[in-house]
Amino acid sequence: MVPSREALLGPGTTAIRCPKKLQNQNYKGHGLSKGKEREQRASIRFKTTLMNTLMDVLRHRPGWVEVKDEGEWDFYWCDVSWLRENFDHTYMDEHVRISHFRNHYELTRKNYMVKNLKRFRKQLEREAGKLEAAKCDFFPKTFEMPCEYHLFVEEFRKNPGITWIMKPVARSQGKGIFLFRRLKDIVDWRKDTRSSDDQKDDIPVENYVAQRYIENPYLIGGRKFDLRVYVLVMSVFAECLLWSGHRRQDVHLTNVAVQKTSPDYHPKKGCKWTLQRFRQYLASKHGPEAVETLFRDIDNIFVKSLQSVQKVIISDKHCFELYGYDILIDQDLKPWLLEVNASPSLTASSQEDYELKTCLLEDTLHVVDMEARLTGREKRVGGFDLMWNDGPVSREEGAPDLSGMGNFVTNTHLGCVNDRKKQLRQLFCSLQVQKKASS
């Protein structure tokens, strides 16, 4: 399955046109024959099992009608369990769109993500040299457990005293994670997994990754945080939120699902910043050049991670995907990729969060373009910017420099001022004029 030809990164974000195997060859075809076909339908039939902000956005979209049970649908925002059980034997007409790629887990399972990134780094070193391969050095040293246990022990003994973190490869929201510094802790864990496997031969041992813990995270007010950036494959969500740890440095897991278990958790108090606020804060502390370098490095994470799976993602024109990238910044302003989520939470934790996710989802639907209004030549749709088209995309000549930094030519606006409503009005008015002129 192929993500759409345009890997777009969300409001306040950047867009990526995916590498070849991740292209939707029919993206540009949304305009003519498909458009006429869709205009003949009275409505777009949608289905979803997610009762959150997404449902509100879908129900309020003009011309969209909800279908339930096994009724025919044109657009299905499904969960990954449905995909796993039904995708291979579900017939879909050409116009139908579904919200996941068949093997999205090549990027979203922690062990597969690391495996693909390591393989891609070696490929770059062979084909383009060490300098280019070094652009993949954005994930901590990681080992899959238990199959790489002996390699891990060798690395552990080379660097005594550092902290490691163990994560289940297929779980989310901070479940099953623990920190350790002693080899005895991992030996005990290994014994536990072996004994449970001996007792139940039909249940496989749950795989983990052992990952070097980032011990010098950037702190704001003494608090650790990570960034959640939404990436639509097809742009980077610019008004994405900065997930701030709710306690001081003793809170190691900055996942909002974990923060909600804190006794003093309050959804309206300082748990999240917008990325725009974060960027302004960093610029005041470190200057615009350092901040531009940081955000350029974050853009590199999106591009290289998608390129790492271009040979393994199954291409399908029916599919798109909204990924949630979790990124940690260290004290040297270096970004680290922690994980990629196939089902980022679309449930709002506050009114501000609800408004942000509403904009994110509305723009996602604009880019997926079930209504066939786009031409396929757009570089920006609402909060989404086209960032990659078999190579980096430059800003249009005469476009304002929203970063305020000058000489910023890449078509990316992560954390910049984002008047998406004005942009959408201008875009759809222009498309309407073009349509009338051609009819």
Swiss-Prot record:
Binding site residues for ATP: K167, Q173, G174, Q211, R212, Y213, I214, K224, F225, D226, T254, N255
Gene Ontology BP, a term: microtubule cytoskeleton organization
InterPro entries: TTL/TTLL_fam
Keyword annotations: ATP-binding, Cell projection, Cilium, Cytoplasm, Cytoskeleton, Flagellum, Ligase, Magnesium, Metal-binding, Microtubule, Nucleotide-binding
Compartments reported by the entry: Cytoplasm, Cytoskeleton, Cilium basal body; Cytoplasm, Cytoskeleton; Cytoplasm, Cytoskeleton, Flagellum axoneme
Signal peptide: none
Cofactor(s) named in the record: Mg(2+)
Residues annotated for Mg(2+) 2 binding in this entry: E339, N341
Enzymatic reactions: (L-glutamyl)(n)-gamma-L-glutamyl-L-glutamyl-[protein] + L-glutamate + ATP = (L-glutamyl)(n+1)-gamma-L-glutamyl-L-glutamyl-[protein] + ADP + phosphate + H(+)
Gene3D superfamilies: ATP-grasp fold, B domain
Site (Essential for specifying alpha-elongation versus initiation step of the polyglutamylase activity): Q173
Listed EC numbers: 6.3.2.-
Domain TTL, first and last residues per copy: 40-380
Binding sites annotated in the UniProt record for a protein: Q173
Record: residues binding Mg(2+) 1: D326, E339
GO MF annotation: an example: protein-glutamic acid ligase activity, elongating
Cytoplasm among keywords: yes
Pfam family, one: TTL
Function, as annotated: Probable tubulin polyglutamylase that generates side chains of glutamate on the gamma-carboxyl group of specific glutamate residues within the C-terminal tail of target proteins. Similar to TTLL1, may acquire enzymatic activity only in complex with other proteins as it is most likely lacking domains important for autonomous activity. Mediates tubulin polyglutamylation which induces establishment of microtubule heterogeneity in sperm flagella, thereby playing a role in normal motile flagella axoneme structure and sperm flagella beating pattern.
Domain topic, free-text comment: Gln-173 is the main determinant for regioselectivity, which segregates between initiases and elongases in all tubulin--tyrosine ligase family. A glutamine residue at this position is found in elongases TTLL6, TTLL9, TTLL11, TTLL13, TTLL10 and favors glutamate-chain elongation, whereas an arginine residue is found in initiases TTLL2, TTLL4, TTLL5, TTLL3, TTLL8 and favors initiation.
Record-given protein name: Probable tubulin polyglutamylase TTLL9
